[in-house]
């Protein structure tokens, strides 16, 4: 580093580390850990673990998007943005928006809906099994068919869970496109 420091180089490193760290975390949580935990833990234990992890995950995603957006926005003259620079700012703003919606609105509602579902399931002796381990008729399907309250709770949970998943995939895609753009700008390895 030059005497007095190379602030531009440091900012670029922070931007790349935060963006790649956020994307790596998102890839792991989205495509690896959830599937492993779902197949390995009893249903209600899995829900408990996810209810503890997701608030941190969404808030960390939100914080990383905010840091990256601030770094990128402060490094460019707004009147002279190239298409790629404007696209990157848009993608980071989209990631920040989706992560914020997930952290502040969808996650608390999804978790509350999950607890309501689990309450009904526990009353019926369900939730202690590992998914895929049950032989015979599906007790959850039978419960849905017999209990309209449970069926409505389940629809509510899957509505919030589906919206949360879409927001999360939007963040993964936005950050992935930003990383791809940065990689394409590298002149040599």
Swiss-Prot record:
Pfam families: DUF4149 (PF13664)
Compartmental location: Membrane
GO cellular component, one term: membrane
InterPro entries reported for this sequence: TMEM205, TMEM205-like
Topology in membrane: Multi-pass membrane protein
UniProtKB keywords: Membrane, Transmembrane, Transmembrane helix
Transmembrane portions of the chain: 18-38, 53-73, 81-101, 166-186
Protein family membership: Belongs to the TMEM205 family.
Name of the featured protein: Transmembrane protein 205
Organism per entry: Pongo abelii (Sumatran orangutan)
């Amino acid at each position: 580093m030059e005497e007095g420091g190379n602030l531009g180089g440091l900012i670029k490193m922070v931007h790349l580390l935060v963006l790649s760290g956020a994307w790596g975390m998102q890839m792991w949580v989205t495509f690896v850990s959830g599937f492993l935990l779902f197949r390995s833990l009893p249903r209600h234990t899995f829900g408990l673990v996810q209810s503890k992890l997701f608030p941190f995950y969404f808030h960390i995603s939100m914080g990383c998007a905010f840091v990256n957006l601030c770094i990128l926005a402060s490094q460019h003259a707004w009147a002279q943005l190239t298409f790629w620079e404007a696209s990157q700012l848009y993608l980071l703003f989209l990631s920040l928006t989706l992560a914020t919606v997930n952290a502040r609105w969808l996650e608390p509602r999804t978790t509350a809906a999950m607890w309501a579902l689990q309450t009904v399931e526990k009353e019926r002796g369900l939730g202690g099994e590992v998914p895929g381990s049950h032989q015979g008729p599906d007790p959850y399907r039978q419960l849905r068919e017999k209990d309209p309250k449970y069926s409505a709770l389940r629809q509510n949970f899957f509505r919030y869970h589906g919206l949360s998943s879409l927001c999360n995939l939007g963040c993964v895609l936005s950050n992935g496109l930003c990383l791809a753009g940065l990689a394409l700008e590298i002149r040599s390895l």
